[in-house]
Amino acid sequence: MRNPIDTFERWLIQSDGLGYADVAMYREFYKGEHDIRLSKRQETRLGITSAQIRSLANICPLVVDTVAERLSVQSFAATSPATERALAMWWAARDLSTYQDDIHLSALRDGDSYVIVEWDDAAVMPEFHHEMSYDGSNGTGIIYSSERRVPLYGFKKWRLEEGDDRGRARLNLYFDNRIEKYITGRAGAWTEYHDGERWPIPWVDATGQPLGVPVVHFPTNPNGDDYGTSELEAIIPLQRVLTSLWVDLIAAADATGFQLVTLTGDVPSEEMVNAARAIWYSQNPAAAWGTIPPGDLSLLVEAVRHATMTIAQVSRVPLTMFQDSRAVAAADTIVASERGLIAKIADRAKTYGLSWRRVMRHAVRLHNTFGPRPALDEAGIVTNWDSFEELDYLTLEKSRAAVAASHLSNGLSMTAAYTLAGYSAAELAAIARTDTYGEEGLTQ
């Protein structure tokens, strides 16, 4: 039998240097915990904490969530109708329509996510466990063969936080034909973990053939590599710039954003507080009053806008999602602005679709080994996605009409109001031809 220490050392050597430490950074930036900190003097001077400034300037969730929200598996197709029905039943029974959101989001944020497929004897069906990517301390991963891109084994490592073994670490290694479980001893050495099952747990079918590694990998944009790339990989440097610009803008606004009153020839009293409607005076005939005009903040404001625009370009998320505007774009404009985003979502769906197919193939294999008859055919399983397009024309029209009505109530002409609301010249002409929406009716 394989020495557990040798097994773990092999895992440790092969998994070293795979960039797991970056996963923790991606999660911190997603939560707004950036590595830019205000000094105590800045916090006191600006009246704002490091946590508040990071929350104010945090764009990372939008970059991830915009893609994750549009990735939704609709159903699975298969060569066999019986297989299709089984997949649909498992999907509904295991609430995977909800759990898929967490799987996709963590894959986009961390670069990789995982699903472990096991068999549930009580429910007589497969069960699916979403596992987070390994961050150097806890999590799941896969080790691939250096010769061919095939999984050698998967792993899950975690720290126990309850029970008699609290403070000890657990490690499961998932091979294609067995599962090995380990736990650290009191001295920190790894030993076999026995929970009433055979050790190692056989992972083979009725004929003794391997069932395959039950850990399924969901990589994001692997670019031919074994592992994925976080959506935040290229955004974090820009996020640091944006956060720093916000600090500069707030500091500049506090120091030079308002007109200052000057006094020469006298000493100001404590009652001279720069407040609204305050009246200052001096009884000294030599006193002279003056003002220092507010500083020009437009360059810093433009720098913030440019950094935001660069993030939009790099992430291929439409700029309109980063900025608030009363003007509503026309439908054609929205479609054009989302082409890059839709292309990225479709690319991610291709990769995740293959992963979902592996999940369901493994589930069928477990059903055929441990479940009731008849056996299911795993051939031809295909992942079907909901539409990636999010354009709701009825909602768009309601929004545009509301914006137009707001402009009209402020006294704008019909042409100006509807142009600002995103209506094209052809749409304006059609509106003007109707009795209900004529110029007179709209401005009454």
Describe each PLM feature range.
Residues 1-129, 444:
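Extended, helix-rich architectural segments
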Residues 103-106, 118, 253-261, 321-326, ...:
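Short coil/turn segments at secondary-structure boundaries
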Residues 193-336, 373, 379, 384-393:
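Extended, charged amphipathic alpha-helical segments
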Residues 421-444:
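Long, highly charged low-complexity segments enriched in Glu/Asp and Lys/Arg with interspersed Ser/Thr
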